[in-house]
Design a protein with these regions (language model features):
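Hydrophobic alpha-helical segments and helix pairs
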Residues: 84-134
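A mid-sequence, solvent-exposed acidic-amphipathic segment
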Residues: 155-192
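Membrane-interface helix-loop-helix modules in multi-pass inner-membrane proteins
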Residues: 47-84, 88-96
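Hydrophobic transmembrane alpha-helical segments in integral membrane proteins
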Residues: 1-15, 131-139
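Transmembrane alpha-helix/helix-exit interface in multi-pass inner-membrane proteins
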Residues: 136-159, 188-192
Length: 192
C-alpha cells in the first residue's frame, strides 16, 4: 500500500510540475522557478522513497528492470532539476518530468519482482556499474540538450520573433553545455 501511495504522489507532482512548466513555456518571464522547484522536490522525494521501498526488501534486493529504470529516471530527474537551477533548461523539464510520471505509473502495472538474496560486493564491479549508470544518465541528458538545440535552431532559422523575447537560453550556451555533457559522458564511459 505504501508503494502505491508513493507512486501516486510522485506521479501527481511530476504531472503538476510538467503542466506548470508547459503553461508558461513561451512566456517572456517563463515558469516560476520557485513553484517548479517545490513541485519537483516533492515528486523527487516521493520517487526516492518509492525506490528505497521497492528495491530494498526484507528478503533481499529487488533489482528488476523496472526498478533499475526507476533509479535511472530518478538520477536524470535530479540532475536536470539541479542543472535548471543554474542554467536555463526549461525545454528539458517537461520532458523529464513527463517521463518520470509515466514511468512511475507504469511501474504499478508491470510485474517486477526479481529478488537477490545477497549482492557480492566487489569494488571493481560496483565502480563499473556506478560509472556506467552515471555515464548513461549524462548521455541521455546530452541527448535532451541536443533536442533543445535543434528546437531553438529551427525556430531561429524560421525567424520566429517569439523565441527572441522568450526566456529560452542562447543557442551558443546550449551548444557549449551539450559538448560539455558529451565529453563528460564519454570520459565516464571510457573509465567504466
Amino acid at each position: 500500500m505504501l508503494i502505491i501511495s508513493l507512486t501516486i504522489i510522485a506521479s501527481l507532482f511530476y504531472v503538476l510540475a510538467t503542466s506548470h512548466v508547459l503553461s508558461r513555456l513561451f512566456h517572456q518571464q517563463g515558469p516560476s522557478q520557485k513553484v517548479t522547484v517545490i513541485l519537483s522536490t516533492v515528486a523527487i522525494v516521493a520517487h526516492m522513497l518509492l525506490l528505497v521501498n521497492s528495491v530494498f526488501r526484507s528478503d533481499g534486493q529487488d533489482l528488476s528492470i523496472v526498478n533499475v529504470s526507476l533509479l535511472t529516471c530518478w538520477v536524470i530527474v535530479v540532475s536536470v532539476t539541479a542543472v535548471s537551477l543554474k542554467f536555463p533548461a526549461t525545454l528539458l523539464l517537461p520532458v523529464v518530468y513527463g517521463f518520470g510520471a509515466l514511468l512511475t505509473i507504469a511501474s504499478l502495472f508491470i510485474p517486477h519482482h526479481i529478488l537477490l538474496q545477497s549482492i557480492n560486493i566487489e569494488v571493481g564491479l560496483v565502480t563499473h556499474i556506478s560509472l556506467s549508470l552515471l555515464a548513461y544518465c549524462i548521455l541521455i541528458i546530452a541527448t535532451l540538450y541536443g533536442v533543445q538545440f535543434y528546437f531553438i535552431d529551427k525556430r531561429l532559422k524560421r525567424k520566429d520573433l517569439a523565441i527572441v523575447h522568450s526566456h529560452l537560453p542562447p543557442l551558443m550556451v546550449v551548444e557549449r553545455q551539450l559538448y560539455q555533457l558529451l565529453n563528460l559522458g564519454t570520459i565516464l564511459l571510457t573509465f567504466a
